[in-house]
């Protein structure tokens, strides 16, 4: 999943807040957005590994 890719997360979040401008609150929103995308990604990949590695 490319959510895991920091470049993807960055452009996704910058696009989401493109009308926000250069205010410091906008930067904070973008950073928060990137963090949450990456957390979602990490959870998804750990879920996958826990199901696939389960012993028979």
Curated annotation (Swiss-Prot):
One of its GO terms (cellular component) is extracellular region. Produced by the albumen gland of the egg cordons. It is found in: Secreted. Its main location: secreted. The keyword Disulfide bond applies. Gene3D superfamilies: Attractin (1.20.1400.10). The keyword Secreted applies. InterPro entries: Attractin, Attractin_sf. GO terms for biological process: sexual reproduction. Water-borne pheromone that attract the marine mollusk Aplysia into breeding aggregations and coordinate male and female reproductive behavior within the aggregation. This is Attractin. It comes from Aplysia vaccaria (California black sea hare).
